[in-house]
UniProtKB/Swiss-Prot annotation:
Protein name, entry field: UPF0270 protein Ent638_3781
Pfam families noted in UniProt: UPF0270
Family, as annotated: Belongs to the UPF0270 family.
Superkingdom in the source lineage: Bacteria
Species this protein is from: Enterobacter sp. (strain 638)
C-alpha cells in the first residue's frame, strides 16, 4: 500500500528517510555524501514522484522504492 509522504509529520518522514539511507549503504562514487545530503536527495525524489513510500502488510514495514517497481 502506498503511503502519501505529504501526510506524515516532518519528523516522522525524516526518521523514515534516515533509516532507509542508513540501511541502504549505497555507494556514491568517489565523493562520500553526508547523511543530510542523502536525506535531501531522497526527499527531492519523493517530491518529484520518482520514488514512493510503501507499507508492506506482509512484513509490517515501510520501504522506499522506485515508482516503476511498485505493484499496488
Amino acid at each position: 500500500m502506498m503511503i502519501p509522504w505529504q501526510d506524515l509529520a516532518p519528523e516522522t518522514l525524516d526518521s523514515l528517510i534516515e533509516s532507509f539511507v542508513l540501511r541502504e549503504g549505497t555507494d556514491y562514487g568517489e565523493h562520500e555524501r553526508s547523511l543530510e545530503q542523502k536525506v535531501a536527495d531522497v526527499k527531492r525524489q519523493l517530491q518529484n514522484g520518482e520514488i514512493l513510500l510503501v507499507w508492506s502488510e506482509l512484513h509490517e514495514t515501510v520501504n522506499i522504492m522506485p515508482r516503476n517497481q511498485f505493484r499496488g
